[in-house]
């Protein structure tokens, strides 16, 4: 939050949540990698809306939808729809998206068994 002082009042302005997250992703590469892991975990645990929303923030902060479209061969508008909270990407398209984001963040995913 940012305080703005005028002669008569003090007003608090806030930034939208996604803007705050995007700014932090740009500042902290480790935070971006943690968010990526959170997105994958959310999707695997059945929380697709949460996972897709996180992936969208990562794309907005790190890649851009135009570049993601180039990397995946998918349409930019289609990617926007797929990464919407109500998006429903196919398994193939989701795989292309998470692979491109991982490569852009220099992440090499691995599977561990508990």
Please place each PLM-identified region on the residue numbering:
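N-terminal flexible/basic segments that precede or flank functional cores
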Residues: 1-54
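Short, charged recognition helix plus adjacent turn
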Residues: 19, 108-114
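Residues that mark the N-terminal boundary/hinge immediately upstream of a DNA-recognition element
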Residues: 64, 90-93
């Amino acid at each position: 939050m940012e305080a703005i002082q005028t002669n008569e009042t003090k007003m608090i302005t806030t930034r939208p949540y996604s803007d705050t997250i995007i700014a932090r992703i740009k500042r902290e590469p480790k935070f971006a990698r943690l968010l990526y892991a959170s997105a994958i975990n959310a999707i695997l645990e059945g929380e697709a809306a949460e996972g897709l929303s996180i992936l969208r923030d990562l794309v907005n902060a790190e890649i851009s939808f135009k570049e993601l479209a180039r990397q995946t061969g998918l349409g930019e508008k289609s990617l926007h729809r797929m990464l919407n909270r109500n998006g429903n990407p196919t398994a193939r398209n989701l795989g292309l998206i998470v692979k491109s984001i991982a490569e852009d963040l220099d992440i090499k995913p691995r599977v561990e068994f508990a």
